[in-house]
Amino acid sequence: MIRVISYNLRKNRAITELVELAKTPDLDALCLQECIASELPAEIGNLHLADSTKRNRLGLAVYYRKDRYEQVSSRSFELKKSLHDLIFSPTPERLVGAKLVDRKSGHELVLASFHAAPLTALNSLRRKQIAAAHELLQELGSGAPILMIGDYNYPLFQENLSDKVAKSGYDLTLSDRRTYTAYKFFRGHFDFVTSQGFTIQDVETLPRGSSDHIPILVTAGYGAPSSVEAA
């Protein structure tokens, strides 16, 4: 079993909350979005920085428990750019992943932090980004189970998205409560998880912090999800 918190820090504003979040019981990893990667510490509590994006003004990062997991490799990736990326803030890297080995069970896995294009882009672009991210993580993991957690910026038509990712062997799992409430017409589940080779046991929306997004806690067990078994 692995327990991961994902949090969009809202332009790094919520960075000071990470020390307390890292104290979450039995927490194994953190996936961050909208952080200033150059200012991230190497350690947050007992979590170690696996990797972060390098070229973004606001980037992504993955932390993991070094006593529980061994890091095999990691990499950040560019995805198809939205108009927002081309005109405004440079955000070429929207995915960072780390291949880990569970020291207890021997399982290999890929853990990734993902941030899709903003709401000014079309859902079709975000679907292309998600599909490309899944393919890149499969290459990184060489067939290892995948957890891709983050800000998908996909509050509407999620059932359609779930059907599409299922066709490629992934499960989409929302949290128990919505994760974004800043905009009246775009409240909902922005932050969630897509996975392959895991059984998602729980996705809990945690208490609100200073970000416009609310952190989520994913609890997952090793084992094929229903979409893979049915394939």
Where are these regions (language model features)?
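Membrane-interface helix-coil boundary segments and nearby low-complexity
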Residues: 1-6, 225-227
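Active-site beta-strand/loop signature of hydrolases that rely on acidic residues for catalysis
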Residues: 4-9, 18-41, 63, 98, ...
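Acidic/histidine-rich helix-loop elements
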Residues: 4-12, 81-89, 120-122
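Structural motif corresponding to alpha-helix initiation and N-cap regions
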Residues: 12-16, 57, 187
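Short glycine-/acidic-enriched loop or helix-start segments at secondary-structure transitions
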Residues: 15-16, 39-43, 47, 123, ...
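Structured beta-strand-rich core segments of catalytic domains in phosphoester-bond hydrolases
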Residues: 29-110, 114, 199, 205-208
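Metal-dependent phosphoester-hydrolase catalytic domains
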Residues: 73-74, 138-144, 152-231
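Charged helix-capping and loop-helix junction motifs
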Residues: 126-134
